[in-house]
Amino acid sequence: AEQGYAIELDIQITKDGRIVVFHDDTMKRMCGNEGKISDYTYEELQQFHLGDSTEKIPLLREVLQTVDGRVPLLIEIKMPGLSTAVCAGFQKEMEGYTGMFCMESFNSLALRWCRRHMPQTLRGQLSGRFSKDDKVHLILRIMARHLMLNFIGKPDFIAYDHRYADCPGFLIDRMLFRTPAFAWTVKDEHVYNRTRKKFDAAIFEH
């Protein structure tokens, strides 16, 4: 935040409907225990620490209070299924927040929900190459990779895995619709310079 760059973060919903900031699909890597965020209530999550630190999984509202509009936020909504409860929770948490923010998701249904209920919020479609481990039907994986589900979410921008920027679907979208595109995740200057030819901006690690 001190450098003025936007912050990308991921949100998930707990078993009792609280919206927390947490990246991974499971808690194994960061907390050392099995299960997903949605398997626990927020109170139960407070027994776990992040890595070797004393920090705990924060609520979205706590992060919003810390950032306090100093830099823009790019908020990824983790929505693995059909339930839009996390979207409704996101809307509630963002009410009254005066800082700049936009949302993104791999799930086109999350974009559609936000388009209907938060029409002033910019929406981004995340995509890239999907594997069998993603537990998504083959046809849906192909359609998502080639951005063939954009008619559902009608994204304002694309956030695409830069390693697969030669994907026909991505190239066609760029040529025909000229949808602004973010490259993810850029980890060094060499990759950044290479992605500048095909993308408008980058989501990077520091």
What is each stretch, according to the model?
Residues 133-206:
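C-terminal active-site rim and adjoining tail of enzyme catalytic domains
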Residues 13-26:
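Glycine-rich, proline-tolerant flexible connector loops at the mouths of alpha/beta enzymes
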Residues 23-131, 151-155, 159-163:
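Metal-dependent phosphodiesterase/phospholipase catalytic core, i.e.
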Residues 6, 122-124, 201-203:
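Paired acidic/hydrophobic, glycine-rich loop segments that form the ligand-binding mouth/hinge
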Residues 7-9, 22-23, 75-77, 204:
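Active-site flanking residues adjacent to catalytic metal/cofactor-binding acidic residues
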Residues 3-5, 18-19, 71, 102:
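The start of beta-strands in P-loop NTPase/AAA+ ATPase cores
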Residues 14-15, 81, 109, 165, ...:
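Short alpha-helical
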Residues 1-13, 152-157:
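Catalytic domains of carbohydrate-active enzymes, especially glycoside hydrolases
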